[in-house]
């Protein structure tokens, strides 16, 4: 967690979400080391290390459970460590890492603006419901070109507009 952050709760995630280490540090976000390949004991040790740094609660954001076992591993880590599990809030982002990066930015902004742990957890749940990326399996599917005269916006432009719309949202 960034040293300039004086909050009482940490935001952690299971992957860097396409963000650079310096960006994650600026957001005050910690990444569970090797979370996508970790076992429950390693994740439990990571959570304990966060608590030993003086943090009282942890908001732990994870890749969509259908794509990764990291949320299941985090749940097992909480079950194996009942003394700290009540202070950890696990969130299934319902998304791939790109959208999680947007969620991390919003959660960090909420924390910096003084949001309580409970409010940040509720916000994380709300973001998980509304921030979504599309995942399309392309198993030999032939796509046709639209005969529409107006070309549609690229996925990148749509994500940029979504990011801008979410970033300008003054939720808290």
Give names to the regions the model predicted:
Residues 55-58, 89-93:
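Short, flexible active-site-proximal loops enriched in glycine and acidic residues
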Residues 34-83:
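Class I S-adenosyl-L-methionine
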Residues 2-8, 13-30, 34, 67, ...:
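Mixed-charge interfacial surface used for oligomerization/domain docking
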